[in-house]
From Swiss-Prot:
Subcellular location: Cytoplasm
Keywords tagged on the record: Aminoacyl-tRNA synthetase, ATP-binding, Cytoplasm, Ligase, Nucleotide-binding, Protein biosynthesis
InterPro entries, A to Z: aa-tRNA-synt_IIb, aa-tRNA-synth_II, aa-tRNA-synth_II/BPL/LPL, Anticodon-bd, Anticodon-bd_dom_sf, Pro-tRNA-ligase_IIa, Pro-tRNA-ligase_IIa_arc-type, Pro-tRNA_ligase_II_C
Reaction(s) catalysed by this chain's protein: tRNA(Pro) + L-proline + ATP = L-prolyl-tRNA(Pro) + AMP + diphosphate
UniProt protein name: Proline--tRNA ligase
Subunit structure: Homodimer.
Amino acid sequence: MHAFLGNAQLPSTPRGDRLEFSEWYAEVLRSAEIMDVRYPVKGMYVWLPYGFEIRQRVVEKLRRKLRETGHEEVLFPTLIPETQLKKESEHIAGFEDEVYWVTHGGLKELDEKLALRPTSETAIYPMFALWIRSHADLPLKIFQIVNTFRYETKHTRPLIRMREITTFKEAHTAHATEEEAEEQVKEAVEIYSSFFDELGIPYIASVRPEWDKFPGAEYTVAFDTLMPDGRTLQIGTVHMLGQNFARTFEVTYETEEGDQEYVYMTCYGISDRVVASMIAIHGDERGLVLPPDVAPYQVVMVPILKKGVRRKILERAAEVEEMLREEGVRVKVDDRDMSPGRKFHYWELKGVPLRIELGARELEEGTAVVFRRDELERETYAFEELPDVVPELLEDIAMELRKRAREKFEKGIFRTDSPEEARRLVGEGIVETGWCGSERCGVRMEEEFGGDVLGTPYPEEDTEFERCPICGETAEYTVRIAKTY
């Protein structure tokens, strides 16, 4: 195991202090060797092997869910011609000041500027127009996992706000009817909900307000989670595009009756922020706490070697390793020439769910000591119990992480009809209050409460609030407000 960033050290910043979260987060990314931030382009970072393995396991989990629901994977070029990018005026207006442009090929100035993909609607939909001919070609459901580029002018932060998003999963679908497209939105929400649940990431789903929806969409459903500092992080979006892009890019199909109709479209995306939220929500003062599904190693074995029985201890460790591998468990035996205490700290920092300690006493007694990373507690088990016990413990750890994260998340949601209380609580978490539905009052809430309007609950629900705190009119909706990344 190469030490890319030197000796691994536990974070020096307490994770429990919300005011110090940013420093803790930066230290953990460095100490656990998730990313190297020293790349000489602002907002662009290097995935290190351990972090990249976590990323790959997260990506594969999502890829499986998409394939199971009939999505097919594609890969589009990174460059988009300027005329194509600007064809949908409302869409480009939302991205124009963030686009990276390629203007030269070598020393020669290009006849037309090429954009580094900020998102792929304008690249994909001209191809949809070529691929879709009749009703028999529908629905069409594709996805790709690619890099996207946005010239972020806000404070950049690894995995949270980057100029090169290295893990952008975007799905795009086309349908014959509006009803089928609406059903696709529901399916996308279900896919993401299941995905976040399995990673133990708690969330709310909200319909974004008109002034904050995806450019060119009819409406946007967004998933937000709550970070330890009280700010929300958008971790996924689902967009109902209707026929807007189909009309722009002439995406039509021939009906059974022989008529030409525009298709209805949806798109939905997830990025590196999933990994960021998983690190932030589950981590503690000792470093990462990884859900077993996506941990590079689910179990690390630390042989506590002693003269006279060294060989026998290593043989027993090899036996345990083989037993667990047969059960489908990812195991690492750490036989480095290093003190057990240093190894314990190292793997706690890395967030490995279970540690098995094997020494002379365990060898003599036919036992093993198992340490749970989530609870920081040890338990002794008989050697022959391990193949049954370890998978059960991994499953229990996943459930416990989900439960713990959800309980903490729900404590960060506040319901109030008082403007003064909303103003005070908005920095602590998510505030829910009444809203008349007007953009004027929504924007005023953002100004007066000091947060961003996340939107209204999805699926829609009746509001318990009587009045809009801004205008005093009848509340038609519950609205969510929070400070955001």
